[in-house]
Amino acid sequence: MQIQENPGAVSRAAQERFGEAYSVLRQAIADHAFPGCAFGLLVNGSVLLHDSLGNFTYEPDAPRVNPDTLYDVASLTKAVATTSAAMLLYQRGLLDLDTRVGDLLPGFVIGRDPAEHARDVTVRHLLAHTSGLPGYKPLFHTAATPYAVLRGCLEMPLEALPGARAEYSDHGFILLGKALESITREYLAAWVMREVFTPLGMTASRYCPHPAIRAEIPPTEEDELFRQRRIQGEVQDEHAFLLKGAGGHAGLFSNVPDLLRFSQAILEPRPESLFQPETVELFATRQPPEGNSSALGWDTPSGASSAGQYFTPGSIGHLGYSGCSLWIDRRDNLAAVLLTNRTWPHRESQLIRSVRPAFHNALRKAL
């Protein structure tokens, strides 16, 4: 699906039209919310904004971010890669969303106390973050291999009955990725590259960037806890790192043009296109229980959402821990991408939380 793009620098008219959005981002850089960013806006199939600000780090001689800079998009992997794989497998009749996870991954139920009801956890629960699995446990403190990470997730005690509570869970998506691999019979990363990214023309998106291009990717962190070195051009997430750089929850590197191409496929699904309308509608629908903002693999606007005030009901989006976000408004036919390395040099800063809604509000007010 083609997107109209205007080659060359952003016009002065566009910079003036979206001046408030630029101001939000410039102030964020000045406040050290992040050292630089790339961003884009797609409306009715046309790219109205595709630009960048700032640098890779806060050092004066650091490389400048350009509009096509590749970023570690962290948990955007869950939506753009893993959920897309689930969508296609569902469309092709290869995945029933109500399949029990234990039927795909027997290690998830073997040896468990029946009172946990792990046998009742389904693929749908994993997508909706309602499996009962905890949100996050640092398995990397004791796990040193992909097998150890997977085993830690498989054996992790449930903290709620399946479907009873919503809790965003990395571990659930690690298991989801492995469950999908049991269907595709190949590594999820390779399958997604071939079946999702190649058809959509997402030529920059990849896992495990080649060492030759790592210097062209903004660093995410000076890691003093786990790897004891600068993390640049390799996945920041510790569990994804132990999973050879690619997990169902993290590992993807992408850029603004590719994420806008992906968004266009979501915004204008057709029977003959990659994503069919009925599939998009299903995966964009909020899931129980009451109060859960998650659809299937996607978040939806709720309360003080990172999407801001103007994304309409039916919009879907996702955040990445590294400082990235993608929001898609299906009613108003638009998508907004913001890519940053807000975790540089250390991950404690939470200033991005106020930047995201302010940026999205400024974009929407300019339309």
Q: Across the structure, where does each feature detected by a protein language model lie?
A:
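Short, compositionally biased leader-like segments
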Residues: M1-F18, L296
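Short, conserved catalytic-motif segment at the N-terminal edge
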Residues: S11-V73, L94, G111, R151, ...
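Active-site SXXK
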Residues: G19-R26, F39, G45, D72-D98, ...
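Short, surface-exposed loop or secondary-structure junction motifs
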Residues: H50, T57, R112-P313
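Short, glycine/proline-biased beta-turn/loop segments that scaffold the active-site neighborhood
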Residues: D96-D113
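Short, gly/Ser/Thr-rich active-site loops of penicillin-recognizing serine hydrolases
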Residues: E268-P271, E278-T279, A284-R286, G303, ...
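Short glycine-rich, acidic/polar surface loops and turns
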Residues: G314, Y321-I328
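Short, well-ordered beta-strand elements
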Residues: L326-W327, N333-R342
